[in-house]
Structure formats: structure tokens, C-alpha cells
Amino acid sequence: MTRLYISGPVTGIENDNIQAFEDARRKLRRYYMVDIPHEYVYAGAPHEEAMAILLHQLTDRTYSYRKGKRANLYEGVALLPGWEQSEGARLERAVAEACGIPCKTVDEWLEEAR
């Protein structure tokens, strides 16, 4: 099953926008394994620390028995609405694409799976 990382705006949004991330995860879980950044970064972490943790997580490579080689932990990034205005989400997208990880909106991933 494809594993996705959800990226979107967090900083400056009430409760770190966790409701939007949880809503997206709930929709995507029908078709994908899904992680959200809130699982890896503690509430109130400085932005620089959060980004270091999340970029490390996003670019992690592990041995894939299915593929018989080391592969990206995530096979895709699902972008929440508003990602374009988020410095962190834009950086996550750029890094993911540089690592060959496809990035699409949540709706695009859902449409592809149906």
C-alpha cells in the first residue's frame, strides 16, 4: 500500500491546523497509509527544529522488500489547501520533488485512487 505524507500550513493557525490534517488523513486512509507532521514534532517546537525533523522524516529511505532495494519511505506527498502560502509546505514539496517523490493535492490523490 502506498504511503503518503501530508503537507500543508501549520504555523500561525489555531491548534497547528491539526483538524485539516486529520480530516485529510481520514479521507486518504481508505486507499493509502498516511502520516501527518504532528506525529513527529511536539507542539510549540521552534520552526527551524520542526523543519529539520520533518525534512529528515520526509527524505528517509528504508529497505523495501516489495521493491527489493532501498526506497523512499514515502511514495507521495498530499498537499492541503493553502500549501502555497506556507513556507514550510513549499520547502517540503521542493525537497520531495528533488528526491523523486510525487506531490499532488489531497483531492488529486483521492481521484487517482478511485
Regions found by a protein language model. Give the residues of each.
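Conserved catalytic or regulatory cores that recognize and/or transform ribose-phosphate-containing ligands
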Residues: 1-114
